[in-house]
Amino acid sequence: MDSRVHRDVGSNTHTGMKRLTVIAGPCVVENRDTTMRIADTLLLICDRLEINLLFKASYRKANRSRMDAFTGIGDMTALEILSEVHDRFAADVITDIHEAEEAARAAMFVQALQIPAFLCRQTDLLIAAAKTDLPINIKKGQFMSAAAMENAVGKIRSVTGRPVIITERGNSFGYNDVVVDMRNISLLSGICDGVLVDVTHTNGGAYRHSFALAAASIAAGADGIFLETHPDPGKALSDGKNMIPLYEVEGLLTQLKQIKEVVG
């Protein structure tokens, strides 16, 4: 096992989030080698910068627009790769689930679960995730107000006292566009244990916008960011246009840490 220090998920709750927190990784597990390369790079960066990292990758994409879109390499194969990331690097890993039946199985391989934005109101899914007793990240739906997310958090807290993070994912602004309302950061902070901002799915398919979104989010009081990254986004099998190239992540996180230190 890698000698890096394992950090317990949830030790960095909103009431004591002094370190920048990042959920980062590829959109989906494409293969073992790419996943390990991304995890190794991110962990080296975050250890060096003293940033809390949750490594994220979907083991299956269930919400693709096109029938011929890539959905995964097989559930068990992908979950075993995510488990290997944890074992090899002593890293906390998070993956998303789309149906209640997935929760217990996924929880055997990862240290936290994520609820997709489109499903953030699904009671059965939220309760199933809560019953695993793992920390949970809920991505706020593009159709949801910050205040409405209190109900989603309440469903989870009716079952478990484990940390609940909300990731701001923007709000619909006409057809095929979203905008991030920075007021939501302070509004959400009162109802959960930490607020992150998704800076890749809100960039309109132009990853350069992610840098300004990330800086503004931390300056506005977010505890951290959610981002997806890939060594070669042009060859990524899912969401390549939104992804930040892996070689640019360190510069971004260095800047965000500096902002975080100023705003506290």
Give the positions of each predicted feature.
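Alpha-helix-loop-beta-strand connector modules within alpha/beta enzyme cores
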Residues: 42, 70-93, 129, 133, ...
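Conserved N-terminal beta1-alpha1 strand-loop-helix module at the mouth
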Residues: 8-81
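Short beta-strand segments at enzyme active-site cores
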Residues: 51-58, 93-97, 197, 224-229
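Short, well-ordered coil/turn segments that N-cap beta-strands
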Residues: 18-20, 49-53, 89-93, 109-111, ...
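A short alpha/beta connector and helix-capping loop motif
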Residues: 35-39, 103, 107-115, 123-132, ...
